[in-house]
Amino acid sequence: MEHLKYPIGLFEAPSFNLQLCSIWIEELRQLPGQMRGLVEHLSPEQLDTPYRPEGWTVRQLVHHVADSHHHSYARFKWALTENRPIIKDYNEKNWAELEEAKSTDIEPSLLHLEAVHLRLVRLLESMAEEDFKRVFIHPSEPDPISLFENTGRYAWHGKHHLAHIQRLISREGWAV
């Protein structure tokens, strides 16, 4: 079950590396198109299929990624404009269980993901090396999170959920 839950493994933050940051920014740039390419032709029944037993549906995953990356974008801006801000956490599981996340068409979330990533990538590309060392405080994390780490975490997060959907499509033999 663990391989279904974490198909690309857990995120492990490496030491600061500006070249790695550039790779992550490119992955973030590509994520909305990759997500759209995977899900835009799925039927409503396929969108409502859980990616694993007791897991979210594809529809919930799409809405979750849009919600989560919106939060991440705000965290970058807080950390760039405030000194060690304490960010507001949210219960992603509860958000995904809202009827809206279970039944709304995915197109608004795909458009939102595209818009957020346009802004996020532009913000990341405008940052100086020292900016990536700025931090925010996450209430459920023991250590401050640097913007370098957050960049990697969200590049990983996108690939993590793309892998959930890709593997489901492959297991089910769905045409893409």
What is the role of each PLM region?
Residues 20, 27, 53, 57, ...:
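Alpha-helix N-cap/loop-to-helix boundary motif
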Residues 1-30:
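Terminal targeting/low-complexity segments that flank the catalytic cores of oxidoreductases
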Residues 19-54:
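Short, contiguous, helix-prone interaction/anchoring segments in small proteins
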Residues 16-20, 95-109, 140-149:
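Acidic/His metal-coordination segments adjacent to aromatic residues that form catalytic metal sites
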Residues 1-12, 48-93, 121, 135-176:
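Short, contiguous alpha-helical
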Residues 38, 42-45, 83, 127-130, ...:
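A short secondary-structure junction motif
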Residues 22, 26-29, 59, 63, ...:
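A generic "alpha-helical surface" signal
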